Amino acid sequence: MKKVILLLIALVSIIRAGAQDEEKPVKNIFQGTRFINLQSANVDSKNELQMFIQHRFGNINGGFYEFFGLDEASMRLGFEYGITDNFTVGIGRSTYMKTYDSFLKYRILTQNSSMPLTVTATVAGSFPSIKDVIPEAFSDFSEKASGNVQLHIAKSWNKVGFQVSPGYIGTGYIPVENNSYSFFTLAAGGSVKLSKKVSVNVEYLYRFEEEIDYVNPLSASIDLDTGGHLFQIVISNSQQMFDQAIITNPTGDWSEGSLYLGFNLVRGFNFKQY
């Protein structure tokens, strides 16, 4: 609970901050539309397509025998498209549980000289298509599908960005828990630009659910903007890359050195000229 109170205090500080606002709208507070694993307040521009190739290797504490995680990789391939400058849709497919995911994302407010914050809403869902793993009692679509709603509230101070994201998730059936849950969440993240093309990020999510055995997800990354690509080098206690698994199944633990290295490779395509 102390962590939640600190996050709420940070949000109040953002709103009351006296830092000088930009004269022009601040549309991209962070380098990408995903913070690290979770969504950021950014959206794609109209007619912009982004392709995501996300890789997380196995646990680094497997040592040389597991080649520090390279033998047990998990992957997600995703696509996002900007319907308008404020509305993005996305789909993806992960190797974990052969899971398909999708989301809708709408930017409600944009930071500018008269508006201190950017506010974006996300509605996401996922569905595991793996066979012979989920019990018959949970085989219906409604039992297996998950849904996650988040509100992303972000603020930029030149080279520094901060975001809090309250949310609510219905997990669907979770094999490792042999159960399903519905609960509130609160995520927070910060980003610092070291240069025009390099930034560092940290994100954390708190679950208002005590029955799930795993720790809360905590991730860090270094972002490299090469022009046509965004390359993120990631270290996290969560190996998976869609909301349900990120939130409920972070199998690593920072305190034990049980972590997953990986990367996000994002390639953008602009169709405005066609």
Where are these regions (language model features)?
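Sec-dependent N-terminal signal peptides
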Residues: 4-13
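Sec/Tat signal peptide C-region and signal peptidase I cleavage site
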Residues: 15-19
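Transmembrane beta-barrel domains of Gram-negative outer membranes and organellar outer membranes
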Residues: 20-138, 144-149, 154-164, 168-172, ...
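A mid-sequence, solvent-exposed acidic-amphipathic segment
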Residues: 161-206
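Short hydrophobic/aromatic segments of transmembrane alpha-helices and their interfaces
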Residues: 181, 213-214
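Substrate-binding/catalytic groove segments of enzymes
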Residues: 194-201, 212, 229-232
